[in-house]
Amino acid sequence: MKILVIHTAFIGDIVLSTPLIQRLKDMYPESEIDYLTLPTNKSVISNNPNLNEIILYDKKGQDKGIKGFLRVLKILKQKKYDYAVIPHRFIKSILLAKLAKIPNIVGFDVATGSFLLNKKVHYDMKKHEVERLLDLVEYKGEKIPIRIYPAKENFTKINKILEHHGYFGNEGQKLILVAPGSQRAEKMWPIEKYREIIERLKKNKNYFIGITGSKAEKKLSLNFPNDKNVIDFRGEINLVEFGALISKANIVVGNDSSPIHIASGFEKPFVIGIFGPGKRDLGFFPYTEKSNVIEDNEFYENNIVKIP
């Protein structure tokens, strides 16, 4: 069987779909599973052993408009898929599968263009997003964890950076990651609050604080050039390397964005999600019991997260 997953949303959404990928492979172990997504999302699923191929649809770049749509459609037609699973809730994704003549297409009832689906699944707002995605394949079993798969070279690079700053994972040393950015500015906790957290933590020389994010997030004013135990990873590592970094962390603090979802896929860190407009009730909180969510706007203004 040839299966296609279509999901062209944000990075965090792709991370949350990794349990769905695992479940599809468990259900159809001999199948070939391809994943269609944006180029910016590729690295977070690039080493996933359950995927056969990642197909890129640069809908905001070179594939923008009808010409790009037709280019991707041609690829899908040639693949002759048997089954399409579409977490993305927009008609363009459903149209790609329909026009590619995939005989079995499943997606959510709230999707625009859901009338084109062979099977519509209820999008249950009471559930976590991971569980909603697993509803697409009618899974009701034990929890399937989020997973990304850093390679050996990713760990080597991260270890080299950490050791350069004096972090060796020795007893007493703590690695705390702070992810202050988001692709949506309205989800970001005030940067001065993150600065205050870092200022407090860096006083303990056994605490190593890693500031993470994209190259664009370097503009956020969190610079500590004279503090060796504050390490700025922004723009220096990709998402899979970020996974390798997270696997070593004791604590991850971040906004309602992809870092807290990636962190949920690793056993070691305790995850603190700081939520503003994206409320926990929407189902996008950290998918791990080792977590805490702060989502009261008034609380933001009067408190600093306390980290032991």
Please provide the spans of the model-predicted regions:
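Catalytic machinery of carbohydrate-active enzymes
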Residues: 1-308
